[in-house]
């Protein structure tokens, strides 16, 4: 049996880039909670002792940007300079303007258009992917890397590993074989965890705790064997972290946000963007389409692409590839997808209920992945029934 190795990585909510994603989405949540028609393009950057939010926002909402920044940093665990940032003392810079009136009239017709007439907020192409290798219909390498990161945060916050600090990265290499286009995981080849820690803990303690409290609960035993390689804080020391260690910026972790290097990516980031931005809503609907193809048994693995022109409601193209795993030809599946899903931006917002704020909905997406999560707020993970006829054997 010929196998190959594939690797996916993840970063924790305390990673500077992810801190920025969460601030941008917390701002979006605050705007949508008061005004579902808010137009938001919010970027965040951070470095030692400073967080800046900037961009274009048009909203009726009354938003205290500085409070949102501080609350978000605090909830992640940035409560002193020692851990990389002090939410209460850091500088917060705000430079937010209204959306360009040129874009507003071209895309939204200044709110005069019916939903089905609303044009895409920008050009671009987005991909959705699904695979039958996990219950989430997501790639195993990505699922494990993401869950290890989420577990690191859990044991930091519940006190099981009190020496942990907010910043951290994970990476998992999985050995696969290709079953006529479908991906079948055989074993976990390598687990890498680099986590920020306090001064008091030894490398041996770190390794023992990570194995016991993080790796064991996350990686199913059947994937681990005596040959599995563990790199646990391989650089030795990681005390300085968060924005003190590295600068951070919204939209710099787009592969972690999606499929861990599987499938494809159109390049557009998600966080800080309202649903009229097809970078986000387009990527969400094609995930729903790809997931529905696999969940309905039409294929074991699928990728769906959609593309847009600014100001134009109808997509320019929709593409489906099932990597040779389709039960019926891809062109038939494409026809079913186009009949089932409405790819017009105004309709995607309605069908996926994307304008609903509150519940920290989009901030939840901004750490540990936008896809494969079991949460009712992740409406794009709901499988739609697809009508198709099985070809008799």
UniProtKB/Swiss-Prot annotation:
GO terms for cellular component: cytoplasm. One of its GO terms (biological process) is S-adenosylmethionine biosynthetic process. It comes from the Eukaryota. InterPro entries: ADOMET_SYNTHASE_CS, S-AdoMet_synt_C, S-AdoMet_synt_central, S-AdoMet_synt_N, S-AdoMet_synthetase, S-AdoMet_synthetase_sfam. SUPFAM superfamilies: S-adenosylmethionine synthetase (SSF55973). Induction: Follow a circadian regulation with higher levels in the light. It is found in: Cytoplasm. Its EC number is 2.5.1.6. This is S-adenosylmethionine synthase 2. It comes from Beta vulgaris (Sugar beet).
């Amino acid at each position: 049996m010929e196998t190959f190795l594939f690797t996916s990585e993840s970063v924790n909510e305390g990673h500077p880039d992810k801190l920025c994603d969460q601030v941008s989405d917390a701002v979006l949540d605050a705007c949508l909670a008061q005004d579902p028609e808010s137009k938001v393009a919010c970027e965040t950057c951070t470095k030692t002792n400073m967080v800046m939010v900037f961009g274009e926002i048009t909203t009726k909402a009354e938003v205290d940007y500085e409070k949102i920044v501080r609350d978000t940093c605090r909830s992640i665990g940035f409560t002193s300079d020692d851990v990389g940032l002090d939410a209460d003392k850091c500088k917060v810079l705000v430079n937010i303007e209204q959306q360009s009136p040129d874009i507003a009239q071209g895309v939204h017709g200044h709110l005069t258009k019916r939903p089905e007439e609303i044009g895409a907020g920008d050009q671009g192409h987005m991909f959705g992917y699904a695979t039958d290798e996990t219950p989430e219909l997501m790639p195993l390498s990505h699922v494990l890397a993401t869950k290890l990161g989420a577990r690191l945060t859990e044991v930091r916050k519940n006190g099981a590993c009190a020496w942990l600090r907010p910043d951290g990265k994970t990476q998992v290499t999985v050995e696969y074989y290709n079953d006529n286009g479908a991906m079948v995981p055989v074993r976990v080849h390598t687990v890498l965890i680099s986590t920020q820690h306090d001064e008091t803990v030894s490398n041996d303690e770190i390794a023992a705790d990570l194995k016991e409290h993080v790796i064991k609960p996350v990686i199913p035993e059947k994937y681990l064997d005596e040959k599995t390689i563990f790199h646990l804080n391989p650089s030795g020391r990681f005390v300085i972290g968060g924005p003190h260690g590295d600068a951070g910026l919204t939209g710099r972790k787009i592969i972690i946000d999606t499929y861990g290097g599987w499938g494809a990516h159109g390049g557009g980031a998600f966080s800080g963007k309202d649903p009229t931005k097809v970078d986000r809503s387009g990527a969400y609907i094609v995930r729903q389409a790809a997931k529905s193809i696999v969940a309905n048994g039409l294929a074991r693995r699928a990728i769906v692409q959609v593309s847009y022109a600014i100001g134009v409601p109808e997509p320019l193209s929709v593409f489906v590839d099932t990597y040779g795993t389709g039960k019926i030809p891809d062109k038939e599946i494409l026809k079913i997808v186009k009949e089932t899903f409405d790819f017009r931006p105004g309709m995607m917002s309605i069908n996926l209920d994307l304008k609903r704020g509150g519940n920290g909905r989009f901030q939840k997406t901004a750490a540990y992945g936008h896809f494969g999560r079991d949460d009712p707020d992740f409406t794009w993970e709901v499988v739609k029934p697809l009508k198709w006829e099985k070809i008799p054997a």
